[in-house]
Amino acid sequence: GIDFRDYPTSLELLSSAGAEVDGERVRFPRGMCREIITASAPAVYTHHGRNPARSVQVGGNATVFAPAYGSPFVHDLDEGRRYATIGDFHNFVKLAYQSPHMHLSGGTVCEPVDIPVHKRHLDMVYAHLRYSDKPFMGSVTATERAQDSVDLARIAFGDDFVEGNTVMTS
């Protein structure tokens, strides 16, 4: 099962939908999640980039390539294996942007430990917006970070466009 800590509303909602709730642990009957997703998610959608020519179809028979996600370490010829920095993050976003084989610039392409955690997500999303015009993934490590990602997307794409289109995934 999955523990949903400090979210009693979620527990009530999942229980009423047919999941087995035991305290904070939720167990989903076989097929329940697939049924919910199939009934509510589109089979195909467009993930928009700032450059419309780089927008990609997700779903159907489409294959979408994105960089690796979340590595705390990088490796270079001078220093070998080391913790990632925001400079490394910028370089990976630029590399993904330049690669004709990458459809997205990514999300957390590496974890820049030289930036304080409470503001790191802002620097990362900004890097995607500054160094690439491909679709990207926002930060979802906390509710407020997800909201910050949406707010930055609104600045880049405009409120009306964000309301009616997929400009970020995670």
Residues of each region from the PLM?
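Catalytic alpha/beta active-site cores
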Residues: 11, 27-170
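Short, glycine/acidic-rich hinge or "gate" loops at secondary-structure transitions
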Residues: 6-10
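Compact, charge-rich alpha-helical regulatory domains located at protein termini
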Residues: 18-20
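N-terminal alpha-helical targeting/anchoring segments
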Residues: 1-4
